[in-house]
Amino acid sequence: MRKDFVFIPDDQPGVLARLGEAAGAAGINIEGISAFTGEGKGVVHVLVGDAQHALEVLSEAGLDVRAARDVLVLDIADEPGAMGAICRRLADAAVNIEQAYLATGSRLVLAVDDIEKARTLV
C-alpha cells in the first residue's frame, strides 16, 4: 500500500529542494507530488512506497509530516476520459474522493472515504 504524506511548510524558496535532496540521499523515490501555496504556507502531498523510512527522513530534514494515509494508486490509460470513467464508478457507488493527483507513469492517486469499497470498484 502506498502512503500519501502531507506537510505544511512556510512558503519559502528551497522547501521542495530540501525534500528532494533528503529523499534522494536516503534512496527514497518520490513517486508523486502535489504542492501549492497560499497565505504564507504551502501544502505538499508526497507519494512514497516505504512509509516508515520516508517519515524518518522527512522528519530529520525538518519537514513536519502532519498526516499520512493509505491511497489507491491506479495505472490508467493516457487518454481522454480515463480518469473520468474511474471517478464515475466511485461516485456511482457513493465513494467520495477526498484527494486526487496524477503521479509518474499515468498513475492516478486517490484518497477516498472508503478505501476497501473503492478497491473492489476499480
Task: Describe the predicted segments one by one.
Residues 1-122:
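A conserved regulatory-domain signal marking ACT and ACT-like small-molecule sensing domains
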